[in-house]
Regions:
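C-terminal catalytic "cap/lid" subdomain
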Residues: 1-245
């Protein structure tokens, strides 16, 4: 109804978490929504609950929105909650205040509770994790109060005056493939365990591929282009990757 009042055409896009699990399906979705936007049609994306497998459903709409923002190389992602943002204490404490900006790497463990928001399925912990991941990919993320009147208009027209928490985006470019991999851990088909030398190289600043000589053993069944978890010599997960052979 809102879009109709402004004569803006919209189109519903139904997706599932599995549709993000392969590169081909991922790109098909991106191309579909790109064409819609090029023709001035606003995509409204929802999970297709009728065919989604319970074990593979999105955690909440925050997770879905993060995937879409990353996939479409959005300029910004706005996540709405029932509070004004991330507080430096309990939101119920009159002495607490909203953290207006969060830089890359800032430790938020003292401020976030794993409780669910009454505004949706996801809690602030989920929102924060999604926000940090998307901001690391170069996209500005804003957490604001969805129960405030005209909150979206205020964020767009008066961004500095509107109370919210803004995650500062990374300045380092991230390729489309790496964005897809970053959000694909839930689709991992197996694990690749690597030795100490390969772990050190992988943890260096230089981007590298893992060669067979650095692999000690594998778990699960996977093939080319599948997503796998990367485990170090002590059994700790150190990354996620795409199989190239």
């Amino acid at each position: 109804e809102l879009f109709r009042e402004h004569s803006i055409p919209v189109g519903q896009v139904l997706t599932t978490k599995e549709s993000f699990g392969t590169r081909r399906h991922y790109l098909n979705q991106k191309n579909c929504m790109t064409v819609m936007l090029e023709n001035n049609v606003i995509p409204i994306v929802n999970e297709n609950d009728t065919i989604s497998v319970s074990e593979l459903m999105f955690t909440d709409n925050d997770e879905l929105s993060g995937l879409i923002a990353s996939m479409m190389d959005a300029q910004a992602l706005i996540i709405l909650s029932n509070i004004d943002g991330i507080y430096n204490g309990s939101p119920a404490d009159p002495g607490s205040s909203v953290i207006r900006e969060i830089d890359h790497g800032k430790d938020l463990s003292n401020y976030i509770q794993a409780t669910k928001s009454s505004f949706g399925r996801g809690g602030m912990l989920t929102k924060t994790n999604i926000a940090r991941k998307v901001a690391d990919e170069g996209i500005t993320v804003i957490i604001a109060n969805g129960k405030r009147d005209n909150i979206l208009v205020d964020l767009l027209q008066h961004p500095k005056e509107t109370l919210c928490t803004r995650f500062i985006p990374s300045n380092e470019p991230v390729s489309s493939v790496k964005k897809w991999i970053a959000h694909s851990e839930g689709f991992a088909k197996g694990e690749i365990h690597i030795n100490e030398c390969a772990t050190e190289v992988l943890n260096s600043e230089k981007a590298v591929s893992i060669l067979p000589i650095g692999i000690t053993h594998v778990e699960g069944e996977f093939e080319k282009d599948d997503i796998v978890r990367i485990m170090d010599f002590q059994g700790n997960q150190v990354g996620v990757g795409k199989v190239n052979c």
